[in-house]
Regions:
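Conserved short alpha-helical segments that host acidic/polar catalytic motifs at enzyme active sites
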Residues: 1-237
Length: 237
């Protein structure tokens, strides 16, 4: 698979929606994730990321302007022991609760489907990072309608074992802007993952469409120790 330039991938599209990146730093020592949200409506743009325990949650920036919280207020990132869960919706909680009961990532997501926001039927994208005894594996998932038909849910899981240093994968909810919005297609895209968290966060943030970007979260986890550092960038400050 040919590597993409993530800067070019993001800057060439006004609205990829929500996006997840998972990978490994160039020096091989860090497990890396990034998650961004974008918005076209006032309700969707009225959000920030805030820390919540070891994870994050979305929160209304101006509570007085919050209209419908159902699909926009959730915890995108939660940590369950040596696993980090990243998603674009409340399926984070489904994965957390099911895996806490010894179910798998895939089993948890079989209980969920795409969002009910007709006619877009926004895909649910999810990822799980597993770090144990110096080993690091991850998986990514997308649940989407059958080419816009809500009668069928298509479920895809991509598992990556022993990820090479400096490589990662990117998945987003939409291919690009549109009406209705076209769901992401194909495998998660291969990209380079650098060592510098701040520089990577800045690159991603600067590449996202200025009008539509809302918030970005980046975390680098030390594979040997489990210690992590994170960065949150919110457009609303």
């Amino acid at each position: 698979m040919e590597k993409i330039s993530i800067a070019k991938e993001l800057s060439s599209k006004s609205y990829p929606g929500r996006g997840i990146i998972i990978g490994r730093s160039a020096d091989g020592t860090k497990a890396v994730t990034a998650f961004f949200i974008m918005g076209r409506s006032a309700n969707s743009r009225n959000r920030i990321f805030v820390e919540d325990g070891e994870g994050i949650r979305t929160q209304a920036f101006d509570e007085s302007k919050l209209e419908d919280p159902s699909l926009i207020i959730y915890a995108p990132v939660r940590v369950l022991g040596n696993k980090t869960i990243v998603t674009n919706g409340d399926q984070t909680d489904t994965i957390y609760e099911c895996m806490d009961r010894q179910m798998t990532f895939e089993q948890a997501l079989r209980t969920r489907e795409f969002e009910p926001d007709a006619p877009n039927y926004t895909p649910r994208i999810s990822a799980i990072m597993h770090i144990e005894n110096g080993e690091y594996n991850y998986a990514m998932s997308i649940l989407k309608s059958n080419n816009g038909n809500p009668d069928s849910c298509n479920r895809y899981t991509f598992a990556y074992n022993n990820c090479p240093a400096g490589e990662g994968h990117f998945i987003s909810t939409y291919l690009h802007d549109g009406d209705p919005l076209p769901s992401f297609e194909g495998e998660p895209k291969l990209l380079d993952i650098p060592d510098d968290m701040d520089a990577f966060a800045d690159l991603l943030w600067e590449s996202l469409n200025e009008q539509n970007k809302v918030s970005l979260f980046v975390r680098y986890i030390d594979i040997a120790t489990g210690k992590y550092e994170s960065k949150i960038i919110n457009k609303n400050v």
